[in-house]
């Protein structure tokens, strides 16, 4: 959904897509919660080891965040990212490992409540954000709307949050956590003003 919204330049189309996507997400979360606890095994993604795919995605994301830190000249971002990168490399290549089957996603009562909160409350905030962003961009006198990017990031954030609360694999949890961190950074700096960049 995030990609669809990113490429949706039409405000009227976005006003249909966002509420529809929020409705589907919220209803799916409630149905998931009503069905109760579950376990989901994911061994492969497109024929590749799921753990390897997530590790590569995590590595690429950390390199991207490191690049942001370099571009901004932020020692804090670069230092924190390097620590995470060292941890990932140590976990994957240095620690002696042995194959233990791990259920990729596990839902218990608490995680299902969290999915419902993220999807319903996050969805309502997203719908409210549509009107807010219209007024905000009018206030900033923007000629070209940044709303496609904004709503794409919001949906990516909500998806990563749901992945985070359902994930049963430490490596995968780090990836979802880093996605939420990057999305937060991008949302805080969304206006691209000096103040927004400093706050991000």
Regions from the PLM with identified roles:
Residues 10-14, 149-200:
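Alpha-helical multi-pass transmembrane bundles of energy-transducing inner-membrane proteins
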Residues 1-152:
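Transmembrane helix-loop-helix hairpins at membrane boundaries of multipass inner-membrane proteins
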């Amino acid at each position: 959904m995030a990609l669809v919204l990113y490429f949706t330049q039409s405000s009227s189309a976005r006003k249909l897509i966002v509420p529809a996507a929020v409705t589907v997400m919220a209803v799916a979360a409630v149905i998931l919660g009503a069905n109760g606890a579950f376990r989901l095994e994911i061994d492969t993604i497109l024929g590749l080891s799921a753990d390897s795919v997530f590790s590569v995605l995590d590595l690429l994301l950390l390199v991207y965040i490191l690049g942001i830190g370099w571009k901004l000249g932020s020692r804090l971002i670069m230092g924190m990212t390097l620590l995470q990168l060292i941890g990932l490399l140590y976990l994957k290549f240095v620690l002696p490992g042995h194959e233990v089957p791990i259920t990729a996603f596990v839902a218990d009562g608490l995680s299902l409540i969290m999915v419902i909160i993220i999807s319903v409350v996050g969805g309502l905030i997203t719908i409210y954000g549509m009107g807010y962003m219209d007024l905000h961009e009018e206030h900033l006198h923007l000629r070209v709307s940044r709303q496609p990017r904004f709503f794409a990031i919001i949906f990516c954030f909500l998806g990563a949050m749901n992945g985070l609360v359902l994930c049963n694999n430490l490596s995968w949890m780090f990836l979802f956590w880093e996605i939420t961190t990057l999305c937060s950074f991008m949302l805080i700096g969304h206006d691209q003003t000096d103040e927004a960049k400093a706050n991000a």
